[in-house]
């Protein structure tokens, strides 16, 4: 498979999970060259090791992911093995959206088929990548889904606006570390761009974590030893200066630092078709 002009060429394989196949047969009917056939599960169970290896060891190739239709299919789907009906179009759309935005995605899901296969009791077809990032999903049975989704969008926007204000205050602190200020400014500069903001958000979290002084670290500084003793007597664990206080508060909401992609999923329920 050629990634594109001036990019790499890769070997491509399709590994099937015998334990997760839903048995619907849609893939067999859709294959244009009759390359697939349905067989008894028992004889294919040894192939589970192949599937597990591919999931665990094969990494995404970034130069295959150029947001074209072809390129999107080499990204990890974060919707898998749902209990939807055979050939369900809803899951095809939802899977594609997770391939494009799944690692920074919020979903407000209307009640209907899309909430039944999307959030059945005790399980979820939505998954995470190796970094533990994936879609955050929510459904409200008795609330209009447009309002529910708008509320999620507005709420996280307000939290991020507050984080931006705190970040500007942090940059203004005279003694804040230069590397922390640089990371903070890089985050501010990209905070409204979902693609560009991903790496600056990670770097900002790392810089925040490294910038906070503990009381024990303060005690090792002769000029701050007395203040450290006062903090220790109060049971404090961290420095209470403006920079450390702001950094700790920003870190308490770090899941909102990365720009999110907000989606409202409908379905037959929202369309008044059930």
Where do the PLM segments sit?
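Iron-sulfur cluster-binding cysteine motifs and their immediate structural context
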Residues: 1-2, 9, 13, 17, ...
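N-terminal amphipathic, basic-rich helices that act as targeting or association modules
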Residues: 71, 79-111, 115-121
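N-terminal leader/propeptide and maturation segments of large enzyme subunits in energy/redox metabolism
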Residues: 141-171, 175-180
């Amino acid at each position: 498979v050629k990634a594109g002009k001036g990019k790499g060429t890769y070997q491509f394989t399709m590994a099937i999970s015998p334990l997760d196949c839903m048995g619907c047969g849609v893939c067999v009917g859709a294959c244009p060259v009759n390359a697939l056939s349905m067989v008894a599960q028992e004889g294919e169970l040894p192939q589970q090791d192949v599937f597990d290896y591919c999931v665990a060891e094969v990494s995404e190739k970034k130069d295959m992911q150029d947001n074209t239709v072809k390129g999107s299919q080499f990204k990890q789907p974060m919707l898998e093995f749902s209990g939807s009906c055979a050939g369900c179009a809803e899951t095809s759309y939802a899977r594609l959206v997770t391939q494009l935005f799944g690692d920074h995605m919020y979903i407000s899901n209307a009640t209907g088929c899309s909430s039944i296969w999307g959030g059945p009791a005790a399980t979820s077809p939505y998954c995470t990548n190796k970094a533990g990032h994936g879609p955050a999903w929510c459904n409200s049975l008795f609330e209009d889904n447009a309002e529910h989704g708008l509320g999620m969008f507005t709420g996280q926007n307000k939290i991020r606006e507050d984080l931006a204000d705190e970040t500007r205050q942090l940059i203004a602190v005279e003694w804040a570390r230069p590397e922390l200020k640089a990371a903070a400014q890089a985050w501010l500069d990209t905070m409204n761009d979902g693609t560009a903001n991903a790496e600056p958000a990670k770097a900002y979290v790392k810089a925040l974590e490294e910038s906070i002084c503990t009381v024990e670290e303060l005690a090792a500084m002769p000029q701050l030893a007395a203040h450290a003793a006062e903090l220790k007597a109060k049971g404090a664990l961290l420095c209470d200066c403006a920079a450390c206080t702001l950094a700790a508060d920003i870190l308490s909401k770090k899941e909102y630092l990365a720009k999110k992609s907000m989606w409202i999923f409908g379905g037959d329920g929202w369309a008044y078709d059930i």
